[in-house]
């Protein structure tokens, strides 16, 4: 399913994708409660993606079972990920996600604005946008002295070509705390890029 862009993805120094679907098993579903077949993960791997972001508004579409199954399949596939975890102990061991590539050490963070009204149930963890948690994660990342801290934020409003006030304010705050790069997802359209 990635045949038309596989070459570009596989040639990237680091290919990060937003896994905005669960791998929750049958029955497979589309909008508004997504669940993809397991073969989708193999297609992602074959396309050359290195990292998947899992904190997004669809990560709980198949509930606790779907999220845990997705994590289990990601773990068995060898594709690294950030954003959702089976429990707090697993999150502490794996997060922030550190990547060493071409002589650079990168700390990767991932958060979502929400999960479409479905709450994560204990002991599962979804990285929601929460300044206290994010600040702790940034401090944890800084302690390991990365060359860059990238925050991948699932935020904003769908089909809006400009970031809203809340996105801009949070972006400013993230940069003030030491994040060096911010990548956004969720709007389903391309929003502007800004260099500071």
Can you annotate each of these PLM segments?
Residues 1-196:
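Acidic, metal/ion-coordinating pockets
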């Amino acid at each position: 399913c990635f045949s038309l862009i596989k070459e570009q993805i596989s040639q990237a120094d680091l290919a990060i994708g937003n896994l905005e679907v669960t791998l929750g098993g049958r029955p497979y579903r589309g909008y508004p409660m997504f669940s993809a077949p397991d073969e989708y993960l193999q297609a992602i791997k074959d396309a050359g993606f290195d990292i998947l972001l899992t904190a997004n508004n669809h990560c709980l579409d198949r509930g606790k079972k779907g999220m845990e199954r997705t994590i289990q399949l990601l773990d068995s596939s060898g594709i690294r990920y950030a954003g959702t975890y089976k429990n707090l102990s697993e999150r502490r061991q794996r997060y922030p996600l550190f990547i060493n590539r071409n002589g650079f050490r990168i700390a990767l963070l991932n958060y979502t604005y929400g999960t479409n009204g479905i709450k994560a149930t204990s002991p599962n963890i979804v990285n929601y946008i929460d300044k206290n948690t994010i600040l702790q994660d940034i401090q944890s990342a800084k302690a390991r002295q990365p060359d860059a801290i990238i925050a991948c934020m699932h935020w904003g409003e769908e089909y809006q070509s400009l970031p809203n006030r809340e996105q801009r304010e949070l972006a400013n705050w993230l940069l003030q705390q030491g994040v060096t790069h911010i990548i956004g997802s969720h709007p389903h359209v391309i929003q502007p890029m800004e260099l500071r």
